[in-house]
């Protein structure tokens, strides 16, 4: 997995402001500080989600030389042209199968898309041409810029992936993964520059594209104020592993709709599996028959393009109708694939009320004692945002998950 810390502009167009520099300005810090902050948050979150740490996580800023080398190779082969004062571009008209990732009928689709959302910049020969290297604006110093044979500048948004992937995986490799939104532009341009540079077709043998998490049936977006961090999930009384289980409920090629009810159901299902395993351990001696096909059922689900919903279905069936070999096979599945603490001896942490919620509840209790009912109502509303309802009792209060 590579880490982008330079070169991504605010849109798919080849002009505008670098995203990191934009957020650095908004948060009054450097672009490197922004990159480091969110890299550390990301690594912390994936650790809590029991996602294995990647063997190599290269950063774009550490591989500028490799990116420049690819640009130079493409220039030497005659695939590029320069727009004065702007940058060096890939001439997609020289690539006979440009856009093939959009098969079937990619040439027709590409023609339709030539009047599409790709902004046509002054000087571009074709709407689908894309920047390999951007020149730094005159009399303007960017935080993230480097020297190159063509002067100071910064890489286009696609070149870093080709550079880092080929450095660590070779000029041709098996699996490339990314979001479905990258098919028409980012991954299409990666293929174009990489196959022209390294003369390997296909550059990648298999491409996996995931769909996205939605919220309440709609797009998840910061502009819509409907995003959730892992901290938000924990503050609402859920374990990161409840969220991990929730993700398994949709195959990666399908959209997954995030709602409070769906996450609650995922939590209940996970805790239900834990209870079934505890019962199975206690009653193991009473079992006699063997399910000779159980391992194959799990393997078939995973072999069906990582069909995790099918895998969960087989898991629930296996634990509802246990056999002598069920426990060992499920334990292997848990250790190698699921990693959701199914064999945990203590799941009390899943039932704890987060400290932040308890603090709010105590503050509301004090507000009522002080007859500050406006503040008490305000805190009640805030608790509702954490999916908690507070009920007054003779001894104080009771918190109910709603």
Across the structure, where does each feature detected by a protein language model lie?
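Short, glycine/charge-rich beta-strand/loop segments that flank catalytic centers
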Residues: 3-8, 39-42, 52-67, 85-94
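Structural preference for alpha-helix termini/caps and helix-kink/transition segments
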Residues: 219-222, 226-402
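Short catalytic-loop micro-motif centered on adjacent basic/acidic residues
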Residues: 54-58, 176-178, 324
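N-terminal, positively charged nucleic-acid-binding surface of large information/translation enzymes
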Residues: 1-50, 390-399
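Surface-exposed helix-capping loop/turn segments at secondary-structure junctions
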Residues: 48-55, 80, 172, 279-288
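Alpha-helical recognition segments enriched in aromatics with Gly/Pro capping
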Residues: 43-44, 65-279
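Non-catalytic interaction-recognition regions
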Residues: 29-33, 43-69, 77-79, 183, ...
